[in-house]
Amino acid sequence: MVNSTILVTVVLVLALRALQWCSGYQHKFIDMIWCKPVALKLQGLIKKRRELHLAQQSTSAQDEYAKWTKLNRQIAQLDTQVKQTQEQLVENRKVGEKNLGKLRLVFFTAPLLVLRFWKGKLPVYALPSGMFPRVVESVLSQGWAAAALAPVRFVWASGTVKPMQVETPVCLAIWLWALSRVLDTSEFVVRSLCM
């Protein structure tokens, strides 16, 4: 059970990181899924406008005024259509970004949050006791709530001695936090070195 929980956690964290790394390509992904018909229509309109513009450039305004004016009107109409299609594409992108955000929440963020609360105190591995101060050991074994409750525990149990433990378990929530920090730091180092 512990191994499968750890495996699911690692897969979710890595998938979420991969999704964040690919966020630079988010507009292409959204265009491919939600905006393809509008993007194709816009591409066709721009191509047609370019052809008409080239035809207008090759036509002499003084010699063939009627043809040049007709092309000019067609270009003006295409400009308004291009502008409307671009506005429609922006609206579709906003809808796509909202939907992608919902998918990210449902498939990655929510399961990680559930794992943190439901299986947060599940021991992942153990460290030798006495390796860290008692406060740090309690955070490692019980999560971040132990750090917040440390003053209360100190006041309530001021005279009692904690029984000696051979090992200090590291809970899933702390392990997940440490994994996220390691990935964040590695990503920062790679981006810093590449720039």
From Swiss-Prot:
Membrane topology: Multi-pass membrane protein
Side of membrane Lumenal, spans: 1-6, 126-169
Cellular compartments per GO CC: endoplasmic reticulum membrane; GET complex; Golgi membrane
Coiled-coil parts of chain: 67-94
Keywords: Coiled coil, Endoplasmic reticulum, ER-Golgi transport, Golgi apparatus, Membrane, Transmembrane, Transmembrane helix, Transport
Transmembrane in keyword set: yes
GO biological process: tail-anchored membrane protein insertion into ER membrane; vesicle-mediated transport
The protein's assembly and partners: Component of the Golgi to ER traffic (GET) complex, which is composed of GET1, GET2 and GET3. Within the complex, GET1 and GET2 form a heterotetramer which is stabilized by phosphatidylinositol binding and which binds to the GET3 homodimer.
Record-stated family: Belongs to the WRB/GET1 family.
The protein's name in its UniProt record: Golgi to ER traffic protein 1
